[in-house]
A protein has these predicted regions:
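Active-site neighborhoods of divalent-metal-dependent phosphate/nucleic-acid chemistry enzymes
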Residues: 3, 70-113
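Short, well-structured N-terminal submotif of metal-dependent ribonuclease cores
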Residues: 1-37, 49-64
Length: 113
């Protein structure tokens, strides 16, 4: 399947909270099959749900999102892209969190926005 969008953890979290009307309207316009999230983002969201104890309402929101958004597996090609990306950015003095770099590598390796 060819995806157009890879939702970052923060975007999915905002969708789950339901407070941003403009974001919700834009997301509703995305066709099923156009959007995905990295398994790294899914792991971050699961961690947050379990850590903060608001799991019931937010977990239900995440399950609703999962009806429209696929979770993409971390593959060998994504891992190779991650290594190259981190190395190149480090040479330029740019350091981001490991999770952010992993999600960026996922998007780059699959040519997704």
């Amino acid at each position: 399947m060819t995806y157009k969008y890879l939702f970052d953890t923060n975007i999915v979290s905002h969708i789950m909270q339901g407070n941003d009307e403009k974001l919700l309207k834009n997301i509703a316009a995305v066709t099923v099959g156009q959007a995905a999230m990295s398994s790294v983002s899914f792991a971050e969201l699961e961690y947050g749900l379990n850590k903060f104890g608001k799991a019931d309402a937010l977990r239900q929101a995440l399950q609703s999102i999962m009806l429209r958004v696929d979770v993409l597996p971390w593959t060998q090609s994504v891992a190779a892209c991650y290594g190259e990306l981190c190395s190149n950015l480090e040479k330029k003095g740019i350091n981001l969190s490991n999770f952010d770099m992993m999600i960026a590598a996922h998007a780059i390796s699959m040519d997704i926005i």
